[in-house]
Amino acid sequence: MSQFIHQLFDLQGKTALITGGSSGLGEDIALALGLAGAEVAIAARREGPLLDTAARLIAQGIKATSFVANLSDLEQAKDLSKRVLSQLGQVDILVNAAGINLREPYGEVSPQSWQEQLNVQLAAPFFMTQALAPQMQARKWGRIINIASLQSYRAFANSAPYGAAKGGVVQLTRAIAQEWSKFGITCNAIGPGFFPTALTAPVFNNPDLVKMHAEKTAIGRNGEMKDIHGLAIFLSSDASAYITGQTIMLDGGYTAI
């Protein structure tokens, strides 16, 4: 039984690239995949936090490498793919976890702000996939995980660009699946509920909002960082080989009731 489970979920010999991997859900996904046996490469804008996170992963016995990239600049997204392949040789698992929500009132959103948020959340995953899927195809195996959101399905105030991008992520996930799954590459999205990350600090800094959102779940609590570990490993492993094009809401039932 243990060998059977090990074979289903073992990621040894795989290399995973996690964008937005220096903090939040990206860091915890990198931790989970690394502990499952994958070599991990993490990418983010700020070198200091990126190096700190890499050190934490290495201290856990994980083989980790860091790459600085600002994915609001799509040329940097393309360059990141080239640098990772040049240094590590291959990418088997791509996790598009970089995110930004500037939380501006609708009437104050500039074209630059709109474009920055769509580039990070929607365009970068598209072009990272475009760059990395062909070398997955050559091995007839690959996993692509996008990060959706509650805002993929419902609107929140002062977050129109973020919500528009996250809605697009759901359809992009289907489009990637349609294009690449016949080559052994699956693409799925994780839709987190409220987790204590930098993006949700305005909620978690307000006890009333924390309580309100917890009460909107079927489980009765908000997400804990460890809650993403199992799903991330599952979608990265052979266990999920017949699942593609899906968005799985990791929200404690927030969108179910």
Locations of regions flagged by a protein language model:
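C-terminal substrate-recognition "lid" of short-chain dehydrogenase/reductases
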Residues: 126, 141, 221-250, 255-256
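Active-site helix of classical SDR
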Residues: 129, 165, 173
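Conserved glycine-rich cofactor-binding loop
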Residues: 15, 22-23
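Alpha-helical segment proximal to the catalytic Tyr-Lys
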Residues: 134, 178-182, 241
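Substrate-binding pocket helix/loop in short-chain dehydrogenase/reductase
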Residues: 105-106, 110-118, 144, 209, ...
